[in-house]
Amino acid sequence: MGSLVTPNEIINPSKQDLTIRSESVKKGLIPYWDRDEVNYLIDRVANHEHQMLLRFLWMSGVRVTEAVSLRKQDIDLQNAVMRVRWLKSRKYQERVVPIHPRLVDLLRLYTATLKAEDRVFPITRQRAWQITKKHLGGKTHKLRHSFAVNWLRSGCDLTPLHRILGHSKIQTTMEYTKIVPVDQGKELIKVVF
């Protein structure tokens, strides 16, 4: 089997984790995994529920607390969107997040037997963190970072990413451009004068 990582990024079999890229640590960048690394790590998870939770976090970019509070009725598979709620300053906030077509298919199968009011992942956030620690070395938010980096590497715009991640300030989302610089010249070509 070919290696997906360099020797500096070798897999630690005891922790089932990839180390943070040395160049991102040196530069003080946000730690992340690239697409192949994340998929490799998640594909190795034998427990179907654990694998689905990790894949959902990776493919949606939502926070753990948002994922574990999600109910089947919050997901609109027909229109490939979900309503995500989170608590901020003692008030619930809500945003609509698009769902990738591949994740729509996975959710359709995974939620088929659930009632509308059932939680998709009926666990606590602490249990979700334990699952992440077991399979990824405890780096739950690194899946969210990986989603954002993958989004930008795919050539998608920063503004929708800002909305999907639910950041209150665009400056927070712009931290990802230190890893994947946004080509503003390419964006200018899209503008019609």
Role assignments for model-derived ranges:
Residues P31-V64:
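Basic, Lys/Arg- and aromatic-enriched nucleic-acid-binding interface segment
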Residues H100-H141, F147:
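Active-site/catalytic core of tyrosine-dependent DNA strand-transfer enzymes
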Residues R44, F56-L57, L70, N150-S154, ...:
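Short alpha-helical segment immediately N-terminal to, or the first helix within
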Residues T19-N39, R90-P101, K115-F121:
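DNA breakage-rejoining catalytic core of tyrosine-based enzymes
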Residues M1-E23, M59-T65, I131:
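N-terminal DNA-binding recognition helix of tyrosine site-specific recombinases/integrases
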Residues E66-A67, G138, A148, G155-K169, ...:
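Active-site-proximal segment of tyrosine recombinases
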Residues K88, L165, K169-K190:
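Catalytic-site neighborhood detector that most strongly recognizes the C-terminal catalytic loop/helix
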